[in-house]
A protein has these predicted regions:
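Canonical Rossmann dinucleotide-binding motif of NAD(H)/NADP(H)-dependent dehydrogenases/reductases
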Residues: 9-38
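Conserved glycine-rich Rossmann-like NAD(P)H-binding loop of the short-chain dehydrogenase/reductase
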Residues: 36-50
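The beta1-alpha1 cofactor-binding region of Rossmann-like NAD(H)/NADP(H)-dependent oxidoreductases
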Residues: 45-46, 67-78, 110
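Conserved NAD(P)H cofactor-binding loop of Rossmann-fold oxidoreductase domains
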Residues: 96-101
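Substrate-binding pocket helix/loop in short-chain dehydrogenase/reductase
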Residues: 104-105, 112-117
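Active-site helix of classical SDR
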Residues: 128, 166, 174
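Residue(s) in the substrate-gating loop at a strand-loop-helix junction
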Residues: 148
Length: 177
């Protein structure tokens, strides 16, 4: 049996946040190509629907779109419930939603700082907890959180203090689960 066969996800169900485009879209595609049913979770519901349709046509898997603000606990809880109901379970999640605001620390506003930390770190916490509770009650699962090399290495000058701090937080949060 080759490595591709060993990595099959046939019958698995999961979601990817920030999946309408970019890294999230690529990982959702990889999960679907490996045999999983996937929810495309994003704030931009129109792009999420396009991605879901594209991946469903490409892979033949069940792919749905769910609009969710990952910084809103009620929306995150409702999203996890919807994934379970529409896909028939939850075996994995990939928390990928994130933003970067480029501004030197001395020019960044507190509101900008909070926005980055809220989406990149608090959003992952909320999603990890909601998905993790379901997984623990139902035999386990896998949680993947997108971090960044910027959590470890800061190229000077790099005007991304909130982004770097948020991604370092994601690494420590993930280790603490």
């Amino acid at each position: 049996m080759g490595i591709i066969e060993k990595m099959r996800l046939d019958g698995k169900k999961g979601f990817v946040t920030g999946a309408a485009r970019g890294i999230g879209k690529c990982t959702a595609r990889a999960f679907a190509e490996a045999g999983a049913d996937v929810a495309i979770v994003d704030l931009d519901i129109e792009e999420a629907k396009k991605t879901a349709q594209e991946l469903q046509e490409l892979t033949g898997r069940k792919v749905i779109a769910i609009q969710t603000d990952c910084t809103n606990k009620e929306q995150v809880d409702a999203m996890v419930k919807q994934v379970v109901e529409e896909l028939g379970g939850l075996n994995f999640c990939h928390n990928n939603a994130g933003i970067c605001i480029n501004a030197p620390a001395e020019e960044m506003t507190y509101e900008q700082w909070l926005k980055v930390i809220n989406i990149n770190l608090n959003g992952i916490f909320l999603t990890d907890i909601a998905a993790g509770k379901y997984m623990l009650e139902n035999g386990g699962g896998s949680i993947i959180n997108t971090a960044s090399m910027s959590a470890h290495i800061v190229n000077v000058p790099q005007p991304q203090c909130a982004y770097n701090a948020s991604k370092a937080g994601v690494i420590q949060l993930t280790k603490s689960l």
